[in-house]
Amino acid sequence: MGVALIVLAAGQGSRMNSELPKVLHPLAGAPLLAHGLRAGAALDPARIVVVTGHGAAAVEAATAQLAPEAICVRQTEQLGTGHAVAQTAQALAGFGGDALVLYGDTPFISPETLLAMQAARAAGADMVVLGFEAADPGRYGRLVTDGDALLRIVEAKDATPDELALDLCNSGVMMADAQVLLRLVAGLSNDNASREYYLTDTIAAGRAEGLRARVVVCPEAETLGINTRTELAAAEQAFQARARARALEDGVTLADPATTHFAVDTVIGRDATIGPQVVFGPGVTVESGAEIRAFSHLEGCHVSRGARVGPFARLRPGAELAENTHVGNFVEIKNATLAQGAKVNHLSYIGDAAIGEASNVGAGTITCNYDGVFKHRTEIGARSFIGSNTCLVAPVRVGDEAMTATGTVVTQDIPDGAMAVGRTRQENKPGFARKFMTMLRARKSAKGAQ
């Protein structure tokens, strides 16, 4: 029957000091919630249930975008993790597989770790808990074990001195048969210091029924939870450090690794070169051999082999650069395709457009794509030349091997092989400049004498 993924995302996150629900704060270009969903996808879940609470409407809207197949259930009162899991009973009614409990504010659990938990279940453990050896166990719940058996989980505030001396700690992540887990959480008590229903108490309850519980240990860094802006900033730094190291190992040249910023889904091919101060937003693929020069910002775009971007370029969602294209300094590309060998080298905006093979777009060219209500497309054919400071008023098409004269405002289609000229004819007035400047200086002198 597969695995049901339960993501707990109901917490208020008051220490974030924000109107935005904690799980929607961005990390590496994606909300915290997305990271747990991304890791859980490694198990190919048959069902996804997200438990919402604080800011439920916003979290549910985000969930619909991140995982349209997910079911959202609300925890109207935040009475603990066990109570949160209990809210999934209806959504998981009749589900015959395992349930994996993850947390919307714990973004670094790796797919490999979750697969190890699944392997422990397959090896005979009825319940599997993810643990870690903490450098500073202080506030974490402790895992009390006997050999390879997990006996119970004790929250720090309820632990004895001997239990507090343990350094094997609880991450909160758990896997068990879904119906067994739901039965156990339904029987929990809130007789503890916080008057909450702890998911951790299901281990002792399960052992009382003869269930076997085991621990899978992961690096402490994977269990980092986000509760404050400081922790969020630290998590961003940790993610970027890992992403930079991975890129270098994969054969990417980073001119200044410390100033390169990746998103969680950035894909960069071997032998690509990334200059200093480059920022990758979500949804970027850069193929092998491409070059991204300094101070460029990319999101939602595809850069093909041999393409060159920047410096100081911006690629927005929908930008598609074919092989050996050039996008130069202070150029913005949005929802536009550049065919092989096309060049837009200076000071231009290209939006909602298609530029043909080997065409050249001169400095200062603008596609005027927005009429105040609707967006319109511009098409430029192959091997065409767009003169500097051209305005292309969409919808409009420039044919193959066509040209525009410098400063032209194009409002009609240009046939193949034609040149468009649309500007005021220059008129020279002999001697006018000297007369005009003499007049202005006289006015200035008269004004100063007053």
From Swiss-Prot:
Its cofactor is Mg(2+). Keywords: Acyltransferase, Cell shape, Cell wall biogenesis/degradation, Cytoplasm, Magnesium, Metal-binding, Multifunctional enzyme, Nucleotidyltransferase, Peptidoglycan synthesis, Repeat, Transferase. SUPFAM superfamilies: Nucleotide-diphospho-sugar transferases, Trimeric LpxA-like enzymes. Residues 230-250 are annotated as: Linker. It catalyses: alpha-D-glucosamine 1-phosphate + acetyl-CoA = N-acetyl-alpha-D-glucosamine 1-phosphate + CoA + H(+); N-acetyl-alpha-D-glucosamine 1-phosphate + UTP + H(+) = UDP-N-acetyl-alpha-D-glucosamine + diphosphate. InterPro entries: Bifunctional_GlmU, GlmU-like, GlmU_C_LbH, Hexapep, MobA-like_NTP_Trfase, Nucleotide-diphossugar_trans, Trimer_LpxA-like_sf. Disulfide bonds: none annotated. Acetyl-CoA binds at A363, N369, Y370, S388, T406, R423. GO terms for cellular component: cytoplasm; membrane. Pfam families: Hexapep (PF00132), Hexapep_2 (PF14602), NTP_transf_3 (PF12804). Pathway: Nucleotide-sugar biosynthesis; UDP-N-acetyl-alpha-D-glucosamine biosynthesis; N-acetyl-alpha-D-glucosamine 1-phosphate from alpha-D-glucosamine 6-phosphate (route II): step 2/2; Nucleotide-sugar biosynthesis; UDP-N-acetyl-alpha-D-glucosamine biosynthesis; UDP-N-acetyl-alpha-D-glucosamine from N-acetyl-alpha-D-glucosamine 1-phosphate: step 1/1; Bacterial outer membrane biogenesis; LPS lipid A biosynthesis. Signal peptide: none annotated. Its main location: cytoplasm. Residues 1-229 are annotated as: Pyrophosphorylase. Binds 1 Mg(2+) ion per subunit. Its EC number is 2.7.7.23, 2.3.1.157. It comes from the Bacteria. One of its GO terms (molecular function) is glucosamine-1-phosphate N-acetyltransferase activity. GO terms for biological process: cell morphogenesis; cell wall organization; lipid A biosynthetic process; peptidoglycan biosynthetic process; regulation of cell shape; UDP-N-acetylglucosamine biosynthetic process. UDP-N-acetyl-alpha-D-glucosamine binds at residues 8-11, 22, 75, 80-81, 103-105, 141, 155, 170, 227, 316, 334, 349, 360. Mg(2+) binds at D105, N227. Homotrimer. In the N-terminal section; belongs to the N-acetylglucosamine-1-phosphate uridyltransferase family. Catalyzes the last two sequential reactions in the de novo biosynthetic pathway for UDP-N-acetylglucosamine (UDP-GlcNAc). The C-terminal domain catalyzes the transfer of acetyl group from acetyl coenzyme A to glucosamine-1-phosphate (GlcN-1-P) to produce N-acetylglucosamine-1-phosphate (GlcNAc-1-P), which is converted into UDP-GlcNAc by the transfer of uridine 5-monophosphate (from uridine 5-triphosphate), a reaction catalyzed by the N-terminal domain. This is Bifunctional protein GlmU.
